[in-house]
Amino acid sequence: MTKQRRLAIKMWQEIVDKCKAGDDFYLADYKADFCKKHGLDWRANCYFCNYFDPCLKCPLDDKCGQVYCKVSTKHDVTSAEIILNALR
């Protein structure tokens, strides 16, 4: 497993945890901050985008991570878990 994939799993696990905790946050901001902290450009790596695999339809309401989609509902937790499980 690549370092970027491991970091993506860590990031999506944190997103799932934040959703379950009921935290309100903007997904694009969170991902940009996470990747900046780890020296990555999330826009250039599909693991860090909602469309993490071009062959898989995005489960997050067809919105790219560059759209400021708010993550706080049960549906969003489920969507984030789908991505997390697919990355594992």
Can you name each region flagged by the protein language model?
Residues M1-R88:
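Cysteine-centered metal-binding/redox modules
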